[in-house]
Amino acid sequence: MVKKGSSGRWMSEHINDEFVKKAQKSGYRSRSVYKLIEVINKDKFIKLGDKVLDLGAAPGGWSQVAIKIVGKSGQVIASDILDIKPIDGVDFLRGDFTKDSVYETLLDITMSKKVDVVLSDMAPNMSGQSSIDIPKSMYLCELALDMAIKTLTPLGYFFVKVFQGNGFNEFVKLCRSSFSFVTIRKPKASKLRSKEVYLLTSKLKLT
């Protein structure tokens, strides 16, 4: 159970958060868009005409950013266990990514033409206990990595949220075994006290 004091502090921080205000003013659905935008501006990994797969897309902020960049010549495929309000130009599949049926459907959708970018902002429902939350998060990261390896073009990019803790170093090693380029980003919109960081990988190693 969340203590009233903690809940009140979170609400106060949320209301006064500069990125929340910017998102509301710009019509974005979440403050997390500024994490993505910062890294895109730095690394230029989404471009006009790209095909993008957005995993854990709800409420749709990252898909909003992606479709603006790829334009009508590109494509954004979004998926989440939660529904999202339609976004013009974005194809949405609702379902649990950990279920074989949803995973295989996404593979079928993307196999006809490989994707240029796989995004994953997936996170489990948090219990507040790191011993439970981090393993669940790592499982989602590993599933997203597997999807990226199977669906990306050789020079495609994989951008994934990862929580630092048990299994983090091992996941980075997994990424390095599959991609020639792996870097860690901590965007300004990611709160300093948060253990989340983002991995950006590219140059898929051919087996």
From Swiss-Prot:
<dbReference type="InterPro" id="IPR029063">
    <property type="entry name" value="SAM-dependent_MTases_sf"/>
</dbReference>
<feature type="binding site">
    <location>
        <position position="96"/>
    </location>
    <ligand>
        <name>S-adenosyl-L-methionine</name>
    </ligand>
</feature>
<feature type="binding site">
    <location>
        <position position="80"/>
    </location>
    <ligand>
        <name>S-adenosyl-L-methionine</name>
    </ligand>
</feature>
<feature type="binding site">
    <location>
        <position position="60"/>
    </location>
    <ligand>
        <name>S-adenosyl-L-methionine</name>
    </ligand>
</feature>
<keyword id="KW-0949">S-adenosyl-L-methionine</keyword>
<dbReference type="InterPro" id="IPR015507">
    <property type="entry name" value="rRNA-MeTfrase_E"/>
</dbReference>
<dbReference type="Pfam" id="PF01728">
    <property type="entry name" value="FtsJ"/>
</dbReference>
<dbReference type="GO" id="GO:0005737">
    <property type="term" value="C:cytoplasm"/>
</dbReference>
<keyword id="KW-0698">rRNA processing</keyword>
<comment type="function">
    <text>Specifically methylates the uridine in position 2552 of 23S rRNA at the 2'-O position of the ribose in the fully assembled 50S ribosomal subunit.</text>
</comment>
<keyword id="KW-0808">Transferase</keyword>
<keyword id="KW-0963">Cytoplasm</keyword>
<comment type="similarity">
    <text>Belongs to the class I-like SAM-binding methyltransferase superfamily. RNA methyltransferase RlmE family.</text>
</comment>
<feature type="binding site">
    <location>
        <position position="121"/>
    </location>
    <ligand>
        <name>S-adenosyl-L-methionine</name>
    </ligand>
</feature>
<protein>
    <recommendedName>
        <fullName>Ribosomal RNA large subunit methyltransferase E</fullName>
        <ecNumber>2.1.1.166</ecNumber>
    </recommendedName>
</protein>
<dbReference type="InterPro" id="IPR002877">
    <property type="entry name" value="RNA_MeTrfase_FtsJ_dom"/>
</dbReference>
<dbReference type="GO" id="GO:0008650">
    <property type="term" value="F:rRNA (uridine-2'-O-)-methyltransferase activity"/>
</dbReference>
<dbReference type="InterPro" id="IPR050082">
    <property type="entry name" value="RNA_methyltr_RlmE"/>
</dbReference>
<feature type="binding site">
    <location>
        <position position="62"/>
    </location>
    <ligand>
        <name>S-adenosyl-L-methionine</name>
    </ligand>
</feature>
<feature type="active site" description="Proton acceptor">
    <location>
        <position position="161"/>
    </location>
</feature>
<keyword id="KW-0489">Methyltransferase</keyword>
